[in-house]
């Protein structure tokens, strides 16, 4: 069967010619052979060229295709085929039958030679492979995705924009330089014009005497010596004189005042004055800051009560936080013990830890301090000047040291231990912001005292035995007893923050853990 309609009757052309285009040349597209069933006729499809449709068995010059399968022309085709085989010598055949005869459109698949069948199958595999690749390329989304191509494009575009920005900046810089040069050139031209104008106006007023006695001036001829007659001037000399007069008339008149030089000088002087003014303002600001710094020291003493109040509020806030933490820890301890009891474990690890801590404190209290054998009168005989509050602690060299927490002592008279957070001490201790009791063994940080017999920290404080010392924030009261550092804290003496005694620091009997 044929896939081409029968055309007009023409003379059958030979199947193979010398000038015929081969089927498997690399310069042209090969024809497609489709495999059919053994009972069907295999057809050969020729690919159309841009200007003409060349079949395998037709001449390239023909523009019409000739049907080779008409019954009345079959015998003539066989005769011409035999003639063509005789004419062609050693012609290579790619598609041939089992009888070594050339294949045509009417040749069946079973009649083809195995080599020809293998060649056709290879061609079909290549066609199917390229067809599947083209279909995958058509279905690939990256071909239609603009972001794939825009990534490199955006990078190149940003780089080009940066380069253009740099070029633009360089051009602006060069433009500024050229503008400055243009201004300088204009100033030079104007100054040169003013200089020439001034020269043309002032030269006639200052004649120059030559050696021969003649006078030379602009607009006049050189005069002759005394006693001689002037020679008549020629026409060329008269024309030169006229030109000189015209040029001098161009520069005559009232000169421009003030001159450009004076204007530039005034502008430059004004600019310098503005810079000096800025310097003066900066110096005044620095001096004002220094004066404020010196005046600030005077107000520090007045702001001390407010500072102490803020410190007290902060301590209260911290104590509240610590109390909340203690409550949370206690709740966690209770829940942990309940969980342990639920699991069948009855021992209390917290109780064992408390017992070990108590044993450590008792062992530390039994230790003998190496300075206990020293007499206590060597340090208590010296009078000490006490100032309440943080002033006492800031005045002493060792006042800045924080109080040691939970310091046990072997003797109640050896020193006053300071308890920060409910830590017991063996000796009497003083409270920081509350009124401590003189007989209570321990006192908390913000807890009340059983015997409120002492004045507050910033109230009226007792003074020393030798006289009355005025308090910083209260009134003066006479002292009844002389304070001793090793006999306990004197009420209102600022023992919580330190003492002014020089020899009290190196001879402290508090034990160190």
From Swiss-Prot:
Disruption of the gene: reported phenotype: Pleiotropic phenotype, including early flowering, increased petiole length and leaf lamina folding toward the abaxial surface in an asymmetrical manner relative to the primary vein. Hypersensitivity to 2,4-dichlorophenoxyacetic acid and paclobutrazol.
Residues covered by region (6 X 2 AA repeats of F-G): 446-498
A GO MF term: nuclear localization sequence binding
Region (Disordered): 28-62, 217-239, 356-513
Cellular compartments annotated: Nucleus envelope; Nucleus, Nuclear pore complex
Gene3D superfamilies: 6.10.140.1350
GO terms under biological process: mRNA transport; protein transport
Comp. bias (Basic and acidic residues): 356-365
Biased composition (Basic residues): 504-513
A cellular-component GO term for this protein: nuclear pore
Keywords: mRNA transport, Nuclear pore complex, Nucleus, Protein transport, Repeat, Translocation, Transport
Tissue specificity of this protein: Ubiquitous. Higherst expression in cauline leaves, lowest in roots.
Major location (coarse): nucleus
Biased composition (Low complexity): 51-62, 217-227, 377-386, 428-446
InterPro entries reported for this sequence: NUP58/p45/49
Function of the molecule: Involved in nucleocytoplasmic trafficking. May have regulatory roles in the gibberellin pathway, in auxin signaling and in light perception.
Family: Belongs to the NUP58 family.
Quaternary data: Part of the nuclear pore complex (NPC). The NPC has an eight-fold symmetrical structure comprising a central transport channel and two rings, the cytoplasmic and nuclear rings, to which eight filaments are attached. The cytoplasmic filaments have loose ends, while the nuclear filaments are joined in a distal ring, forming a nuclear basket. NPCs are highly dynamic in configuration and composition, and can be devided in 3 subcomplexes, the NUP62 subcomplex, the NUP107-160 subcomplex and the NUP93 subcomplex, containing approximately 30 different nucleoporin proteins.
Domain notes: Contains FG repeats. FG repeats are interaction sites for karyopherins (importins, exportins) and form probably an affinity gradient, guiding the transport proteins unidirectionally with their cargo through the NPC. FG repeat regions are highly flexible and lack ordered secondary structure. The overall conservation of FG repeats regarding exact sequence, spacing, and repeat unit length is limited.
Protein name (record): Nuclear pore complex protein NUP58
Lineage of source species: Eukaryota, Viridiplantae, Streptophyta, Embryophyta, Tracheophyta
Gene name for this UniProt entry: NUP58
């Amino acid at each position: 069967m044929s896939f081409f309609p029968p055309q007009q009757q023409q003379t059958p052309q030979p199947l193979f010619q010398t000038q015929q285009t081969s089927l498997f040349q690399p310069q042209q597209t090969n024809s497609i052979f489709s495999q059919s069933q053994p009972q069907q006729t295999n057809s050969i499809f020729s690919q159309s060229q841009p200007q003409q449709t060349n079949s395998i068995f037709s001449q390239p010059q023909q523009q019409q295709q000739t049907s080779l399968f008409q019954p009345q022309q079959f015998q003539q085709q066989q005769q011409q085929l035999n003639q063509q085989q005789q004419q062609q010598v050693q012609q290579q055949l790619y598609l041939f039958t089992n009888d070594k005869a050339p294949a045509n459109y009417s040749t069946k698949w079973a009649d083809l030679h195995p080599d020809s069948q293998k060649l056709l199958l290879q061609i079909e595999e290549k066609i199917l492979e390229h067809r599947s690749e083209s279909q995958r390329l058509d279905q690939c989304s990256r071909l239609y995705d603009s972001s794939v191509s825009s990534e490199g494009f955006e990078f190149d575009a940003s780089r080009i924009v940066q380069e253009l920005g740099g070029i633009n900046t360089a051009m602006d810089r060069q433009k500024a330089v050229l503008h400055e040069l243009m201004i300088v050139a204009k100033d030079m031209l104007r100054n040169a014009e003013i200089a020439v104008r001034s020269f043309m106006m002032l030269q006639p007023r200052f004649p120059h005497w030559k050696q021969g006695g003649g006078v030379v001036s602009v607009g006049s001829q050189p005069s002759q010596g005394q006693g001689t007659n002037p020679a008549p001037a020629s026409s060329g000399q008269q024309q030169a004189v006229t030109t000189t007069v015209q040029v001098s008339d161009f520069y005559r008149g009232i000169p421009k005042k003030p001159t450009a030089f004076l204007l530039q000088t005034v502008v430059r002087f004004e600019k310098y004055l503005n810079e000096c003014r800025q310097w003066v303002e900066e110096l005044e600001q620095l001096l004002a800051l220094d004066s404020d710094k010196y005046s600030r020291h005077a107000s520090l003493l007045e702001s001390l009560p407010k500072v102490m109040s803020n410190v007290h509020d902060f301590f209260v806030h911290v104590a509240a936080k610590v109390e909340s933490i203690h409550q949370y820890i206690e709740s966690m301890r209770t829940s942990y013990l309940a969980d342990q009891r639920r699991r069948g474990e009855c021992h209390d690890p917290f109780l064992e830890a408390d017992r070990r801590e108590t044993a450590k404190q008792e062992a530390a209290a039994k230790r003998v301090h190496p300075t206990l054998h020293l007499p206590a009168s060597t340090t208590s005989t010296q009078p000490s000047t006490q100032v309440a509050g943080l002033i006492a602690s800031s005045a002493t060299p060792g006042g800045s040291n924080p109080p040691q927490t939970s310091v046990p002592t072997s003797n109640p008279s050896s020193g006053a231990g300071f308890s920060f957070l409910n830590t017991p001490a063996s000796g009497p201790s003083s409270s920081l912001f509350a009124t401590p009791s003189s007989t209570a063994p321990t006192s908390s940080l913000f807890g009340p005292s059983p015997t409120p017999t002492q004045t507050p920290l910033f109230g009226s404080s007792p003074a020393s035995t030798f006289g009355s010392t005025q308090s910083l924030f209260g009134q003066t009261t006479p002292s009844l007893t002389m304070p001793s550092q090793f006999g306990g804290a004197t009420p209102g003496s600022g023992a919580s923050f330190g003492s002014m005694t020089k020899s009290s620091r190196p001879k402290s009997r508090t034990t160190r853990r």
